[in-house]
């Protein structure tokens, strides 16, 4: 009898513990930031679009404010569209907000956990970041990499001059060749180079799969693993296609780098030192697996190829629609460079309007309109609201860039917004004054893009050389009428967590015969003095 009483007492105690935990959970949920009402059990999952989630998140931000929350089943998500909170959470509380949400697709199927973008905040993450920072820090870019940047952007001018109808490909070749040369010592000499085509095909599918809402939420509802994948958009097959493509491409360049090192050592051949040389020298000491080395090079190949090329294509769109901006930029360029030399990195301090155009391009149509989500690794309170451990936290780049209180008429392309802000993006990202932040395309906090220093210099040189060399205007139809360039955020750009302009027509013409002559002369010198130091595929 006593045993029965003890059992009943224990059961009551357990029930009280469960009820208390449930009550505490309910009480804390009531203290979450405001947000859209959801359905029982599933939360807001049916309200989330499969594409362009940044548009929905920005719509909700106008209703619920700079910090709001929503539910995906039992999981909590929060969206930050407030400059002060970006600084407070991602920078000042970066130790709490630097992890990544669990991603079965990204971490298990595609990368085996070795991709820096989806890697959790850990010792391996810090190791990867340190390796990248050492090779792509500002001083290395200034001392070593700028020479290659100038040479590749000089070829880009030559390519635009000879084949203006392929403008959508020239920027991709340029940025891909820059990063391939720095990573592996192998150039991308033309737009039809196989490794470039393969990378962009992989990147397109990877971007679509990793967009918020694009795959079933198996991390939250594990039972979805048992639902036939053909009912859910063949998400496993698509993920495995990306995994195979990445592994094949990234490991092939890993092997080529090893072969090139052996050949150089056996023949005493001179070759440009690369990022992978540094990694291979330390691989055994650091305990890096071959798969980790593959993805160290691969993640930089992705980031270095896609962001810069897309932003240059966006800039050309805007320039073609705004001849007055071209006119002001050329007045500045002509005063500094004349027509017998193109701009170099040394001209940066004297070309502030070019830098303003770059900043406005990144603000206007950001390539990452919804930065890759962060995860909270500990319970936190923000302005009286509770965010539980494990909350997925989105940095709403699109919403920040199109905040009418900060950027009046945000859909208008207007470089003068950045009058007086002539430093590079890193300086403003590191500034304690969050109102001075120019844009958020590189992310925030400890997850700030490690390629920011290279990207900023490359973007400036690409913009400066193209504006110095060419006139841009909409193409014309058979009747001489301008063909519309679609810059609508929905119809004019691709889907995915990385967005790119859809193909558009544009007339590109050299500004004068003297400019054309200078382009060819400078390319000949760049080819013999710089580009020839790197291997051909």
Curated annotation (Swiss-Prot):
Among CDD domains, the record links this protein to: CYP64-like
| Biological processes per GO annotation | terpenoid biosynthetic process
Q: Which GO terms describe its molecular function?
A: heme binding; iron ion binding; monooxygenase activity; oxidoreductase activity, acting on paired donors, with incorporation or reduction of molecular oxygen
Phenotype on disruption: Loses the ability to produce yanuthone D. Also leads to the loss of production of yanuthone X1 which does not have 6-methylsalicylic acid (6-MSA) as a precursor.
UniProt-listed Enzyme Commission number(s) = 1.-.-.-
Instruction: Quote the record's binding site residues for heme.
Output: 449
Q: Describe which pathway this protein belongs to, using the record's wording.
A: Secondary metabolite biosynthesis; terpenoid biosynthesis
The keyword Transcription regulation appears for this protein: no
Position of the signal peptide: 1-21
Q: Which UniProt keywords apply?
A: Heme, Iron, Metal-binding, Monooxygenase, Oxidoreductase, Signal
Record-stated family: Belongs to the cytochrome P450 family.
Protein known as: Cytochrome P450 monooxygenase yanC
Q: Which gene encodes it?
A: yanC
